[in-house]
């Protein structure tokens, strides 16, 4: 599911017009608008639209969400929005949520690679190893300030 800048109204319309639930199932989703809260409501303080929550419930077991954003932090940014990330991870789990602007190790890029085979989506085996390796490397480094723009 490629969401682009999809907001909750679009998802509501899709949910209302789609009569075959099989067409709504997904296992890999790009978090719309860089993980802003607009997928759920107009304002981050608003309750989420039920259609957006229902759409998340259409995810297959083991589904992934990828945000084309910097790492989501607990702050007032929107996008990316911590509250939106929490909505996604409540459904798919924290380990299946990724940001393309993730931590770098020794200034190396951090690509996110999936294998799609026979209708199944899985994190690429080398990517799993790299993720574990990066996490260990980041944990072992001295804390340094990070600047985001």
Annotated model-derived regions:
Residues 1-61, 65-68, 75-76:
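Active-site-proximal loop/helix segments of hydrolase catalytic cores
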